[in-house]
């Protein structure tokens, strides 16, 4: 269960199935969903919550290259909503089976909404549709829950506060428009 929590936090362990070793028996009852983006996210929490022992080694042994125009770096498409679907399922699973991970599951659930919203707003010509409005509504209605979550970073909390005023301000904040500029004195 602790390993599942680390995956949900996303600092030391990624949700990706690559760079991990598994016993064959684990996959007798679990299958990756077909036709979904972020298919790893659909099963990794259930998988790790169900194992008796997990070993973590943070030494780099696998080097992942982010290609421009890969699935994770491409412009927004409706299939990106699969990320929210995956972490909604994880959140429900955690609530029923390992409530001690609620903080981590909430963090990742909201992270998924931010991830998709960021992709939407960074896609030129994106039209604010029903999915956009639903994501913004979810984040706004959980404003205080997100602010109280100790895993959510300061910059994300500031961006969320901007979203409360308008998506235009949120977009300015996440695009780095307000980066601090240091002046040299002397």
Task: Identify what each model region corresponds to.
Residues 1-55, 65-78:
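Donor-binding/catalytic cores of nucleotide-activated saccharide
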Residues 17, 105, 153-154:
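Short alpha-helical segments used as structural interaction elements across diverse proteins
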Residues 60-68, 74-101, 113-145:
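Catalytic core of nucleotide-sugar-dependent glycosyltransferases
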Residues 101-108:
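All-alpha amphipathic helical-bundle segments outside canonical DNA-binding/catalytic cores
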Residues 55-57, 104:
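A structural signal for short, well-ordered beta-strand segments and their strand-loop junctions
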Residues 43, 86, 109:
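Catalytic-loop motifs flanking and including active-site residues across diverse enzymes
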Residues 124-186:
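Membrane-interface aromatic/basic loop that binds lipid-linked glycans or pyrophosphate carriers
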